[in-house]
Amino acid sequence: MHKKLILTSLIALASLGLSACSQTTLPPQAASHVDVTQGQIIDLHSGEPLTDRQLLVKLAGAQRLIVGEKHDNAEHHQIELWLLQNLQKERPQGSVLLEMLTASQQPRINQVKAWLKEDPQVRDSRIQELLHWQKGWPWAMYGGVVTEALRAPSPLLNANINRDEVMRLYKTPRFPEGKKSTAPAVQAALKETIVAMHGGNIEGQQLTSMLAIQQQRDRYMAQQLLSAPTPALLIAGGYHASRSIGVPLHMEDLSPASKPVVLMLAEKGMSITADQADYVWFVAPAPAKR
């Protein structure tokens, strides 16, 4: 039982935001057209508000785009689906990367993608089965985005380390090399976040392990994004996407010339600054869980 609780904590909390979400949200199939929510979009460098169309034009020019989400907000996934559908209309999409897919799933992703080129009639449950989709990511939230990316002509790539690697890092923490990504201020901010998410009930070796897992996930996402065909789009949790503590710092360590554009999907009332992202799209908070 104790081992099971530790594993649950590692998988669900080390990614800083993964949670069991309501299943009564986004429809699982990819729609032919998605209307996005009436939120507030801001250019964080100029402070100017943008329309969704203005944002789309700006994002279309990015060679590497990171979209940060709050995992349990259904409107964030609706926006992501809208981006997948509409960025492709502005220019060919080079690749899409998802935090929700791990390295070991890539062969299955490739097989399913090739199969879907034949446009078969297929149930969502069958796609989940073939992908070995992880139940921690509710299909009701992610099904539309995943199906859209699978049916698109561009590659769909994993952006997360395997579960066995998570367990190895927990037992023997090791950190990526780099000045920017492992700076004391960055690690202190991540530790503070991890402690807060555990209600203050984490310290010592367990905290070090959780920090190592988070930073190795960030490093892997950065490596995947840098090697992906461009224009590349990475969808991940907000902490991974953040310029101040996440993937962009690892990209700077690995390839200083690479400058990803970051769009943070947030909820009204959150404080998002230009240190964290280039653009922010505010929507209503996710309904409280019952």
Language-model features, listed with the residues they occupy:
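Compositional signal for N-terminal targeting/processing segments
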Residues: C21-R290
